[in-house]
Amino acid sequence: PKDAPIMIWGGQTFEMIASFLGCVKSGHAYIPIASYSNAERLTMIQDVSKSPLVLEIDPLPEVDLTDVKVLKASEVEDGDFEVNEKDFVEGDDNYYIIFTSGTTGKPKGVQISHDNLLSFVNWELSDFNLPEHPSFLAQAPYSFDLSVMSLYPALVSAGKLVVLPHDVTQNFGKLFQTLPKMQFNVWVSTPSFAQMCFLDKTFDQEHHPDLSHFLFCGEELPHSEAEML
């Protein structure tokens, strides 16, 4: 149906971002769902959103989604579609819907309009004196609103996303081996994730010579952490 939101199941990949843009250019908000989520979360989100379609970028778990069409990435890539600017999401239309964790019950959908997103991106790019064509650390899965702080500013500024996969962030050994090898100049995370990285002796200017900006959201930034940085 026209204006119905579309669920997108997958990880931190190019195909996910391409799917986001495909949805909004066809007039539909998208609902990103991380592929490490369980089947119950997927069904609860569908029950709340009434989404009639899920794009399967990564393999779906065994799940019974009644009256929901499953479209594989290969079917989209091989399809023949027309793009009409009149269909684009704009103004007060929902651009994306991100669902809460649901720890206190059913997940709740937070609806963000095109104008909301545009205002946020313009603010970030104009107020923080970021490098030209910035390279952002993309640590948060796209199902978290934190990810928007790197995703769309990177797209608008012809920048780059340097992805830190979810499985790496869950393993200190992998994390502390991987971070020093990554090249980015804008750090985006929660304050608590940065605090965790203080445990690594290589989390310093010597091992991250290009890093010029720290952008935090989602939590309060303690004064002590700001001083350490």
Where are each of the predicted segments found?
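Hydrophobic packing residues within well-ordered alpha-helices of enzyme cores
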Residues: S19, V63-D64, E124, C197, ...
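Conserved AMP-binding/adenylation subdomain of ANL enzymes
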Residues: K108-L137, D145-N185
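Conserved S/T- and glycine-rich ATP-binding loop of Class I adenylate-forming
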Residues: I6, C23, N94, T100-T103, ...
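Carrier-protein-dependent adenylate-forming modules in NRPS/ANL systems
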Residues: P1-D115, F128-N129, A158
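Short acidic active-site motifs
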Residues: E40-R41, N171-K174, S224-E225
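Core-facing hydrophobic residues within beta-strands of well-ordered domains
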Residues: S51, V89, F184, H208-L211
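Short, conserved loop/helix-junction motifs that constitute active-site signature segments
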Residues: Q46-S49, L130, F203-D210
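Adenylate-forming
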Residues: G11, L60, A140-S143, D167-V168, ...
